[in-house]
């Protein structure tokens, strides 16, 4: 296969048709490029301006013609221009040199920091790891964030759906996860910006620099690589940038043998771009106008995100649900691959409970006794049932007041409010805003803390002592401080 690819490398074709981002190219007989090969088109347009673009072969049309999708704008492209077959798929830079950098779908830097300092590159199209190479035993990925580790734990090498609207703290949660995997697991992160707003991509980069996730003075100390294909890019770039980011993550897993976090924002835009390309290629649309290959496209991306015996890629994917319709084929296909969901709640955010992760709506396939153990499972279910009872009582409290509740219900409400407050915690990346030192809470400390609240051991402590702290020792210290201030 490699020999065949080399045989077509350098073969020159001629652009015969341009329809938006799709171009037809004619090659000499017997020298057609393979599907997914990259074509390079360079030259001058009619205005005398230089053009340089890369396109990916998608279809073999017959009559020595292929159809390709451009990875950048085709403005000024004219029929008769020369297209050169590179003989290989699009390849992107990989390794430590990518950390702290922003790259596009082709791995070219777009942050005005000079070239990416790495010699290693890897093709964006490759097979998922073999079954014999996979780590099949489920293992919890500890994040140090209490609400996630207790109620909706992440699977190492799993996929997590992140649901939340604007202003709920998605970005801060992502930054904290990047910080914690670097400090506690010695891992790195890759962020794939797929089809989202350019302004948001820029804001995220600036926030990463402010919080120390990207070290602007010494990029080698950065903890994340960024790969962007934003809303203004052609559909080809938005369709492939997720694979570019995944390829960078695979290098850290397979070569450096590290645990990697891969963020995809937004997985729906990946599907949307595939739908646009499918229509441009003339394929018959499927349900709701999506591409007929929807399941295959999503599966090829998701199956590469996994744990191997060498390392793991744990993926957190922001999921946009069009018109809040969970039965739409795009989110429905994505859900089939998810191991956990983290749902952010506007109600909790408005109460000042951060991270605003909804303890009742967030789910995980890992939360079962056989995986997390009986103690963890029972504690998590007890926390959820207490919060559920509190939710049911809120209407009664709003109409009649707290005094009309039975003694047992009042105790439940008191403990539930403490549990709700204890689910908050200060983040390392938010220290510059809150003035509070960040806290990484080990899972056993988290379980112990919630057990003590539910058993009634801490009924005499004030509710305020449970807000924005790490473990129970800090709750007791804060309660002591509140009491001494009240006496003083």
Swiss-Prot record:
Swiss-Prot/TrEMBL keywords: ATP synthesis, ATP-binding, CF(1), Hydrogen ion transport, Ion transport, Membrane, Nucleotide-binding, Thylakoid, Translocase, Transport
Membrane-topology annotation of the record: Peripheral membrane protein
Class in the EC hierarchy, top level: translocase
Binding annotation for ATP: 164-171
Membrane among keywords: yes
One Gene Ontology term of the molecular function aspect: proton-transporting ATP synthase activity, rotational mechanism
Localization in the cell: Cellular thylakoid membrane
Entry EC no(s): 7.1.2.2
Family matches, as Gene3D superfamilies: 2.40.10.170, Bovine Mitochondrial F1-atpase, Atp Synthase Beta Chain, Chain D, domain 3, P-loop containing nucleotide triphosphate hydrolases
Family listed: Belongs to the ATPase alpha/beta chains family.
Protein purpose: Produces ATP from ADP in the presence of a proton gradient across the membrane. The catalytic sites are hosted primarily by the beta subunits.
Name of the protein: ATP synthase subunit beta
Biological classification of the source: Bacteria, Bacillati, Cyanobacteriota, Cyanophyceae, Synechococcales
Gene behind the chain: atpD
């Amino acid at each position: 296969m490699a020999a065949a690819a080399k045989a077509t490398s350098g073969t020159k074709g001629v652009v015969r048709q341009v329809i938006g981002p799709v171009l037809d190219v004619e090659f000499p007989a017997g020298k057609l490029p393979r599907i997914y090969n990259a074509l390079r088109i360079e030259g001058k347009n009619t205005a005398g301006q230089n053009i340089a673009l890369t396109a990916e072969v998608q279809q073999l049309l017959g009559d020595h013609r292929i159809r390709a999708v451009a990875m950048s704008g085709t403005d000024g492209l004219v029929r008769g221009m020369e297209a050169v077959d590179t003989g290989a798929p699009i390849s992107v830079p990989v390794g430590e040199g990518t950390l702290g950098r922003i790259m596009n779908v082709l791995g070219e830097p777009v942050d005005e920091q000079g070239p990416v300092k790495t010699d290693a590159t890897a093709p964006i199209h490759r097979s998922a790891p073999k079954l014999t190479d996979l780590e099949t035993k489920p293992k919890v990925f500890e994040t140090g964030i209490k609400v996630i580790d207790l109620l909706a734990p992440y699977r190492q090498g799993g996929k997590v759906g992140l649901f939340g609207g604007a202003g709920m703290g998605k970005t801060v949660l992502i930054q904290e996860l990047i910080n914690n995997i670097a400090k506690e697991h010695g891992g790195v992160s890759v962020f794939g910006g797929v089809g989202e707003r350019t302004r948001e991509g820029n804001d995220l980069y600036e926030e990463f620099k402010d919080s120390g996730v990207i070290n602007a003075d010494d990029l080698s100390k950065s903890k994340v690589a960024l790969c962007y294909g934003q809303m203004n890019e052609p559909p080809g770039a938005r369709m492939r940038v997720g694979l570019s980011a995944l390829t960078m993550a695979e290098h850290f897993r397979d070569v450096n043998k590290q645990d990697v976090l891969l963020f995809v924002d937004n997985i729906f835009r990946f599907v949307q771009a595939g739908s646009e390309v499918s229509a441009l290629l003339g394929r018959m649309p499927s349900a709701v106008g999506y591409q007929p290959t929807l399941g295959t496209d999503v599966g090829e991306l998701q199956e590469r995100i996994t744990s191997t015996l060498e390392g793991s890629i744990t993926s957190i994917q922001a999921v946009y649900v069009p018109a809040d319709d969970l039965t739409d084929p795009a989110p429905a296909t994505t859900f089939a691959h998810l191991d956990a969901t983290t749902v952010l709640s506007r109600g909790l955010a408005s109460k000042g409970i951060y991270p605003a992760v909804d303890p009742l709506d967030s789910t995980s396939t890992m939360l079962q006794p056989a995986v997390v153990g009986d103690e963890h499972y029972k504690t998590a279910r007890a926390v959820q049932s207490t919060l559920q009872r509190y939710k049911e009582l809120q209407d009664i409290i709003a109409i009649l007041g707290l005094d009309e509740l039975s003694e047992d219900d009042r105790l439940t409400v008191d403990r539930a409010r403490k549990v709700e407050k204890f689910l908050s915690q200060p983040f390392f990346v938010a220290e510059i805003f809150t003035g509070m030192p960040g806290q990484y809470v080990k899972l056993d400390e988290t379980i112990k803390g919630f057990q003590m609240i539910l058993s009634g051991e801490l009924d005499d402590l004030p509710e305020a002592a449970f807000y924005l702290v790490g473990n129970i020792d800090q709750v007791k210290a804060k309660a002591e401080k509140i009491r001494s201030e009240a006496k003083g």
